[in-house]
C-alpha cells in the first residue's frame, strides 16, 4: 500500500460551532432529522464555519438558520477534537442565552425534536458521539451533576 492510500492518511478537518443554549437550569438539545448522518440522535445545535467566520459568528448564524431564533454567545466552554471515519471534527461549544423574547422553533428538515434537558435527560439521550463528550462540561456550567 502506498502512502497515498495509507490508513493513517490525514483526515480533512471540519470546524463546527455548537451552542449550549441555557435557560432556567436546563440546556437545549436538538434531535437530528431522518436522512442525515446520525439520524434521530441528539446534538447541540450548530454547524460548520463558513470562510472568514469566527466560531461566535457561525454559532449565531447557524442557530438563526436552524431554530429561527437569536442568541447571545457568551464564551467557549469546551473544545473537542473527534475523528470520524471520513473526517476530523474540530468543535467548539459556546455557552449561549436566548435574546429576550426569543424561543427556538422546529424548522422542517433541520431537526425532528427539541428538548430543554436537565441532568437526567442529558445522561439518557442518545447523543451524536462528539456532542456526548460535551455533556460533563455543560452540566458543570449549570451546577448539575451527571448522576
Task: Describe each model-derived feature in a short phrase.
Residues 2-28, 48, 79:
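Conserved N-terminal beta-strand and adjoining loop/helix that marks the start
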Residues 9, 103-105, 111, 130:
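A beta-strand edge to alpha-helix "cap/lid" segment located at domain peripheries
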Residues 36-41:
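A conserved beta-turn-beta hairpin within the catalytic core of GNAT-like acetyltransferases
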Residues 44-76, 118:
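The catalytic Nudix box helix
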Residues 70, 80-104, 115, 119, ...:
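Active-site-adjacent beta-strand/loop module that shapes the phosphate/pyrophosphate-binding cleft
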Residues 119-128, 132:
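C-terminal structural segments of small proteins and small subunits
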Residues 130-147:
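Charged phosphate-binding loop/patch that engages nucleotide di/tri-phosphates or the phosphate backbone
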Amino acid at each position: 500500500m502506498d502512502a497515498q492510500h495509507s490508513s493513517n492518511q490525514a483526515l480533512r478537518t471540519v470546524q463546527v460551532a455548537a451552542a449550549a443554549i441555557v435557560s432556567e437550569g436546563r440546556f437545549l438539545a436538538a434531535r437530528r432529522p431522518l436522512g442525515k448522518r446520525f439520524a434521530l440522535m441528539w446534538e447541540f445545535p450548530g454547524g460548520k464555519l463558513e470562510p472568514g467566520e469566527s466560531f461566535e459568528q457561525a454559532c449565531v448564524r447557524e442557530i438563526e438558520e436552524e431554530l429561527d431564533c437569536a442568541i447571545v454567545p457568551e464564551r467557549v466552554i469546551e473544545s473537542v477534537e473527534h475523528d470520524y471515519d471520513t473526517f476530523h471534527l474540530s468543535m467548539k461549544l459556546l455557552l449561549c442565552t436566548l435574546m429576550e423574547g426569543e424561543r427556538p422553533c422546529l424548522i422542517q428538515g433541520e431537526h425532528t425534536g427539541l428538548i430543554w434537558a436537565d441532568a437526567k435527560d442529558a445522561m439518557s439521550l442518545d447523543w451524536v458521539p462528539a456532542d456526548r463528550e460535551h455533556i460533563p462540561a455543560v452540566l458543570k456550567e449549570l451546577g448539575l451533576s451527571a448522576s
